[in-house]
């Protein structure tokens, strides 16, 4: 009996490591673009958000059947919590609002963590690639449009 319990425990630990690693990689990829552009929330913030969201979801899924934890409620609270963090990076200066893209990116990093925690790795890869591409492509388009408008 001891052997089976050890195997089951090792599977749980391996599953946890896999999910946290996936969340970490997604957060790093998303944060790398923000860091490269010198934004206020870069590698560390996006990676920690993805990991934190993953841990909260993993915990809720772990105890869902034992204590009647509703994992969807935990997911919604992750969104609320990230909303506060995102609000902290949004600034208004004169008639311009700055930080909306960074706030939205932090929100997407939390979603990446949630996807990793639920084992939706293909969806996680698609989300991560889309977030990076959107930030890169539309960041370039935005700056190009701003230059033309200023002329």
Label for each model-derived stretch:
Residues 36-41, 91-102:
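Membrane-helix interface "capping/anchor" motifs
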Residues 99-104, 122-127:
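Hydrophobic alpha-helical membrane segments of integral membrane proteins
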Residues 48-58, 80-83, 104-117:
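Small-residue-rich segments of transmembrane alpha-helices in multi-pass membrane proteins
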Residues 1-74, 121-124, 140-147, 151:
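Alpha-helical transmembrane segments and their membrane-interface boundaries
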Residues 25-30, 84-91, 113:
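Hydrophobic transmembrane alpha-helices of secondary-active transporters
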Residues 94-96, 110-123:
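Membrane-helix boundary connector in multi-pass membrane proteins
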Residues 82-85, 130-140:
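Alpha-helical transmembrane segments and their membrane-interface exit regions
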Residues 67-90:
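Alpha-helical transmembrane-segment detector that highlights a single hydrophobic TM helix
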């Amino acid at each position: 009996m001891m052997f089976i319990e050890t195997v089951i425990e090792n599977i749980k630990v391996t599953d946890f490591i896999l999910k946290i690693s996936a969340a970490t990689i997604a957060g790093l990829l998303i944060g790398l673009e923000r860091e490269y552009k010198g934004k206020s929330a870069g590698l560390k913030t996006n990676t920690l958000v993805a990991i934190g969201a993953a841990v909260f979801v993993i915990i809720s899924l772990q105890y869902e059947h034992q204590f009647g934890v509703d994992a969807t409620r935990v997911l919604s609270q992750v969104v609320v919590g990230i909303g506060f963090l995102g609000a902290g990076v949004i600034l208004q200066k004169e008639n311009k609002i700055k930080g909306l893209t960074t706030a939205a990116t932090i929100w997407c990093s939390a979603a990446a963590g949630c996807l990793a925690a639920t084992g939706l790795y293909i969806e996680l890869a698609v989300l991560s690639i889309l977030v990076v591409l959107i930030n890169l492509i539309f960041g370039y388009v935005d700056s190009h449009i701003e230059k033309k408008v200023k002329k």
